[in-house]
Amino acid sequence: MKRFFPGLVSAALIVASSATAAPFTYTNARFGTVCTFPVDIFTDRRPEPDNGDGQQWLSADGASLICSGINNVNDDTPKSFVAEEKAAKEAGYEITYSKTGKNWAVLSGQKDGKIFYERRLFGKDGVIRTVWIDYPPAVKAKYDPLVGAIAGSLKGP
């Protein structure tokens, strides 16, 4: 029941947060990464990379959503991932929020002038599943209510 309830809440929040936005659930064939988001907002589905690791969607107002997976070849943990990202000295990249749990990590901040939100799940199957959302500050009021539900919908097998 604990695993089912957050998914149900996430789906309900997506619908409630944008009454006109139809939810779409994407499942990555290679890694089994699953995320649900409003397809009425993220309308431009980009071509899948040749390696099949995920998918990207763009919105008309400059937002981007990526749902993907990677093999955890370095045996990263949520804490090591956050520590590494916080230590990064990349220009235009600032983390303003981070949190970790037993098998997940969340980062938020600004990158290249956009607000970003990233959630990663560290699977027992050796796969890190990620949802990344970024958007211009000018549309913050539109996307802030959606981010939590979209990130909360991230799951894997």
Where are these regions (language model features)?
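Conserved polar/disulfide-associated segments of primarily extracytoplasmic proteins
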Residues: 46-145
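Sec/Tat signal peptide C-region and signal peptidase I cleavage site
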Residues: 17-21
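Short, low-complexity, Pro/Ser/Thr/Gly-rich segments in the mature regions of secreted, periplasmic
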Residues: 145-156
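N-terminal "mature-domain start" segment
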Residues: 22-51, 153-154
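Bacterial N-terminal signal peptides
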Residues: 7-16
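Positively charged n-region of N-terminal signal peptides that target proteins for export
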Residues: 1-4
